[in-house]
Amino acid sequence: MTTLHNLSYGNTPLRNEHPEIASSQIVNQTLGQFRGESVQIVSGTLQSIADMAEEVTFVFSERKELSLDKRKLSDSQARVSDVEEQVNQYLSKVPELKQKQNVSELLSLLSNSPNISLSQLKAYLEGKSEEPSEQFKMLCGLRDALKGRPELAHLLHLVEQALVSMVEEQEEAIVLGARITPEAYRESQSGVNPLQPLRDTYRDAVMGYQGINAIWSDLQKRFPNGDIDSVILFLQKALSADLQSQQSGSEREKLEIVISDLQKLKEFRSVSDQVKGFWQLFSEGITNGLRPF
């Protein structure tokens, strides 16, 4: 018989020849066989094996956490790249809208503000544009400009953080804003209905529709001097296009409800205009000989 002191044979298990021995006895002495030879492990060996197992478990857990962090970072970067591709695809169909000028001004501002925080950077972006898709586009431009400036590596890291944060918090809002921009831009060229309210109204209709009363209130608030009938038609066309490309049953139902409500508003507007026209004629006293009271 061979007696082992503080020895380990890797992952090879020892078969206990006396399974009836209580665990308290095994702590002091364990009998078994290894490669056909009887062996005896005395107390110190078991503790050594336990310590090694604990160390291996800790190292594995630490590596697993690092791997998970890297995977999360990789997933975040992939989401940023996906959103960037969509934003570029849509916004390339319209003029730059002062994009290059804004990026240049922000780059100058950041260069002179080495200790700027993430919240301050977001505030600067909002000062340049209230549209999330344009803010995201500016960040992408800043990131590309900073890549060639090794002395501003800390600012590059901050901008990349801001991109990840924006995608995590506003991915749908960014993509929807970019997607509707070409149509909203064309509609705004008449000079009657502003670009940003058009984007906001469309985005709200898709992301958080609150019913016919809410959308009517929004239209009156956002377009006090605009052509509301034209805005309703703009929304109907945009949402109908979304409906044709939508596969999900629940999403289709939501869009159908909004489109139906817009049609009701359109009809209401038509009746309302007729009533106003009739009342104007009546008040002027030229309607079939009737006179105002």
Curated annotation (Swiss-Prot):
Induction notes from the record: Temperature seems to play the major role in regulation of transcription of the yopN-containing operon of pYV, whereas Ca(2+) concentration has only a moderate effect at 37 degrees C., and no effect at room temperature.
NCBIfam families associated with the record: LcrE
Keyword Calcium: yes
Gene3D superfamilies in the cross-refs: 1.10.150.630, 6.10.250.670
Name of this chain's protein: Outer membrane protein YopN
Subcellular locations according to the entry: Cell outer membrane
Keyword set, alphabetical order: Calcium, Cell outer membrane, Membrane, Plasmid, Virulence
Functional summary from the UniProt entry: Plays a major role in regulation of the low-calcium response. Seems to sense the calcium concentration and to transmit a signal to shut off yop transcription when the calcium concentration is high.
Main localisation: membrane
UniProt-listed GO biological process terms: negative regulation of protein secretion; protein secretion by the type III secretion system
Annotated GO CC locations: cell outer membrane; cell surface
Record family assignment: Belongs to the HrpJ/YopN family.
